[in-house]
Amino acid sequence: ATQKYRTEKPNLDDIIFGAAEYAKDGLMPIFEWIGPSPWLDRMKQLTRDVFKQAAYDTPAGKIPSLDVEVAGDLLQVTSRLYWMTGDEDYRAWAFRLADQFLLHSSLLDCDKIGLRDHGSEIIGGLSEACVMASSDDPQRWQRYRPRIRALLDRILEVGTNPDGLLYNAVNPRTGEILSKGLADTWGYVYNA
């Protein structure tokens, strides 16, 4: 390790992507398995640092990324950190992301929804924010509920083959199957 960036000029979007992936796919499984430890401390600090760098102004407030994979990773991380720690910052960040992707924009208006790894994270992340809202913020839940339901219903309508397996990607507006390959991470979406 050189303790240097791979590029001469660091790219904040790339750094945020790497941090979100590391937090969700690297640190979260460890802290969920062993509980409080240096791994949890690392995840908490990494998440705080990501939100300190939030550079995208949205109607919901500043968020670290407009990319649905990154936002989905961060939704899952902040939701679980909130349940684990009770720290209101994580709850606020999760709701800020969910507000942006459920209330101020809609995945149903996009040209593509990925239903496999590197795209479907937003679906699970939004569902985790919905669980949190249903428990802690009933008014927010009432606004989220029809939108998450419409998203999940549309995925079932256009995103599955006759056997109920998910395609890799679909256009939610037109119903066009963009990638007929079958998602090997279907459980992520069906867990939502």
Residue map of PLM features:
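Glycan-recognition and catalytic cores of secretory/periplasmic carbohydrate-active enzymes
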Residues: 1-192
